[in-house]
Amino acid sequence: MKKLVVGALTVSTLLLNNVSATETLKDIHLTGISSTAADIDASEIGIGYGVSVYLDNSIFWGVSFDFSGGTLDNSQIKIENKTSTKNDNSLYNAGGDFKLGYALFNNKLALYGIGSAFYQGIGGIDGAGLGYGAGVDYRITDNIALNVEYKTYSMTSNYGDYDYDRISTGIKYTFK
């Protein structure tokens, strides 16, 4: 593992040598989310803040912090043969993402992978987990971008482990 980390740092240092940021953008974004938590479908709406850096070699990276909330289609949550007795169909989330990818067409289109950490309240049960995914951002103007992201998480809660999957579509207002 140590050799892998040292190798990755060496390669990234060589690739990013003499590379500078051509553009750094901050954004505020709104998202509509369709998700599945513990095998129960949910609808959510979210808001977030992010920073994206476009390098002159077309590498794109960014971080974002998001909050979302919504409702589950069913209030009976079953995780590892334990059923929640709470009559609560609420869902709320807070998370952070790291994005790394490639920007095309003068930074109008960004394709990226996502690594994510997440906290979730699902029907009165708290959970946390790590996840991964992929996304696409398309800037329709200098200040407006549309995006689509898919993420999947392995969550751990006091009731046991469960999966959380989400696909989101959003609009971003970007500024420097």
Positions of PLM-derived features:
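Outer-membrane beta-barrel "beta-signal"
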Residues: 138, 163-176
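Repeated loop/turn-to-beta-strand initiation elements of outer-membrane beta-barrel proteins
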Residues: 56-61, 106-111, 138, 142-148, ...
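Flexible, solvent-exposed loop segments that connect beta-strands
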Residues: 34-40, 68-92, 117-128, 154-165
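Cleavable N-terminal export/targeting peptides
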Residues: 1-25
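Membrane-embedded beta-strand positions of outer-membrane beta-barrel proteins
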Residues: 26-32, 63-65, 96-98, 111-115, ...
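Residue-level signature of outer-membrane beta-barrel architecture
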Residues: 51-53, 67, 98-104, 138, ...
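Hydrophobic, lipid-facing positions within transmembrane beta-strands of outer-membrane proteins
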Residues: 43-49, 92-98, 130-134, 165-169
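Short glycine/proline- and aromatic-enriched beta-strand/turn motifs that initiate or cap beta-hairpins
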Residues: 19-59, 67, 119, 174-176
